[in-house]
Amino acid sequence: MSKYEVLQGFYAVHDELGSGGFGKVRLATHLLTNQKVAIKIIDKKQLGHDLPRVQTEMDALRNLSHQNICRLYHYIETEDKFFIVMEYCSGGEMFDYIVRKERLEESEARHFFRQLVSAIAFVHSQGYAHRDLKPENLLLTEDLHLKLIDFGLCAKTEKGRIDKHNLDTCCGSPAYAAPELIQGLQYKGNEADVWSMGILLYTLLVGALPFEDDNMQIMYKKIQSGCFYEPEFLSPLSKQLLRAMLQVVPERRISVKKLLEHDWLNHKYTQPVKWNTIYDKNFIDRDVARVMSKYYGFESTDKMIEKIKEWNFDYMTSTYYALLHRKRNGMEIILPMVRNSTNTAPPNVQNILCSPTIHASLENNLDKSGLEDDDSDPSSISSSSDISARLKKNCVVSDESSSSRFVKPMSPAAEKDKKMSYVNAMLTMPSQFTGRSPLRIPESPMSVRSSDSASLGSAATPSRGGVKDNDKENASTGKNYRMGASTCKSRGPLKITGVEEGTMKSVYTTPNTRPTLRGLFSPGNAEHKKRQRARSSDRASIGMPPGSPVSIGSAHSANNELLADGRTPRSRIKTNRLPQRVFTSLERKKEKLITLLTPRKMQRDSPQVLKDVKNMVNVSMTASQDPEEVRNLLKKVFDDERMRYELNGWKFLATQETVHGWMTVELEIVRLQMFDKVGIRRKRLKGDAFMYKKVCEKILQMAKIE
């Protein structure tokens, strides 16, 4: 029995993205659409008295649908677990971006902070207070859009009266908590969130915490004093804003309304921050609904729309969001033609909490005022996948022109240029602090091609020829290529070309140059296909050593009768080794089938190969070309620092005890094909973000790999 039986047939669960006190977050694939999602798995036994927090988080996520808040797709409750399926943010944690650049330029910090203020202004307008704002709860999409997560500690008040309601629960992370929380006083949620945003802004601009100490009591005293260091490189406007947000007395603290109008926040922007949601719960994309109606067997698109509007947050809701994500990224909207009759949910899947939510896109309201305008909706790099004619006959595809209210996708080339203009500007901007950009070296003009995602073997799995997933992930996803893979994507028999004519071709010899492989059934091979059988006996006799099984069989067949057209009967040219040859053929076909159905694996003696790391802010490039050397250096650092670690191939899982608890980080040695260098991919699995930053910087510095 599977560990996550309730997810079988709906999601394929992959690597761990992170963990907390009550559960883990795993990367997964939505099987019907092949889109990546994140699944938060919470153990009820570990929750104990905190069980109501999950219900609070679910209520918040259903109602807080905003462009800068991570979207809820699907909610499943079983006897012992909660499964929260959410939008996957492939850009990783915001803190990885800070670790990569050490601190951000003010224009970069402004880009992200405007999005955070937009999200919090909307949260407060709906009567919620987040109460746990910290870098770990800020994620990035592949196009550097910020998404707020983790509403487990949020507080709900009457809508529009958050500034009138007092709270008394002390919660959140100490380094980001407001003074009134530390003192145990009653507080207002909106004022506490403004303080935490001030800490985050300081972190973005300086790369450090304003109030920090290994001794918790000393750190509390620093927070209550409100005194913090102001580096000289900060502009007067940024200093003014930080002082206004980090006021010890809550009544003197700047309000969110005034924060939205502050000069620093709107510097070089043509429009103020748009904090209202761009989604409308009453608007459903008709293209997506039409495809879903054919799959689910609804009589009309309108019937499907009415069903989606129930917002049950079941697999149907998840499918709608996944297809909507494909459309927004210029990918084809496609589902199998007929719903599999065996694709029924297990009984415990039916135990799903249901409630309406705000959603649906009003993309035309986005701010299009320029590169720095944060509210614009950059499209994805991903282009539409190539769908064969045979597949299209068996699949449902949207056939309506883009006449709906949803923005029509641009051409793949235009989409890529539009998005990369800003992403590259952000990632290649040199830092004043370090003097280098996150990439640190020029881009290579090499082309990038996505690979297939892992095979999905279940009743609900689309056919193998389905649309490829063009999402870009930090984890092992479509853009990660591995060395030593022996698979070949050509279909059917292969013809070897590129060998000089006139040279004797023996099946036991290898050409000096690497041959070109091409499918035998391509248009250019029509004549070859007609002549193939006629030359089968000739192939066996050319270049064979005397006495070999093939040459003996050929000599024997020469004495047999010929057919009317002069050809030798196929049965006559076979030898008494036929059973063995048939068995060998079957074995080879079995190996090929296994190879096709198994994801590419890296060789044990080679690290994983990454073809493209442009948007991977959690990858550090080394000066070395020898992965073994880097691995030995990391081992030495871990031993010198007396850090516990486990080594699995090229992946380190290191842990260290800190004043804030245990810190767990994953470091994987990879090969950067674009630059012909060895890199290190970082991932924080558990612990405080700043401790993660310190540990990573210390390890990379001591290993002398930056």
From Swiss-Prot:
Effect after changing G198D: In gm301; production of an additional HSN/PHB precursor cell and an additional PVM precursor cell
Annotated InterPro entries: KA1/Ssp2_C (IPR028375), KA1_dom (IPR001772), Kinase-like_dom_sf (IPR011009), MELK (IPR034673), Prot_kinase_dom (IPR000719), Protein_kinase_ATP_BS (IPR017441), Ser/Thr_kinase_AS (IPR008271)
GO molecular function annotation: ATP binding; non-membrane spanning protein tyrosine kinase activity; protein serine kinase activity; protein serine/threonine kinase activity
Biased composition, class Polar residues, residue ranges: 447-461, 506-515
Keywords: Apoptosis, ATP-binding, Cytoplasm, Cytoskeleton, Developmental protein, Kinase, Neurogenesis, Nucleotide-binding, Serine/threonine-protein kinase, Transferase
Family matches, as Pfam families: KA1, Pkinase
The record's account of how the chain is modified after translation: May be phosphorylated at Thr-169 by par-4 and/or autophosphorylated which likely results in its activation. Phosphorylation is not required for co-localization with the centrosome.
Cellular-component GO terms for this entry: centrosome; cytoplasm
Protein family according to the UniProt entry: Belongs to the protein kinase superfamily. CAMK Ser/Thr protein kinase family. SNF1 subfamily.
Protein name, UniProt field: Maternal embryonic leucine zipper kinase
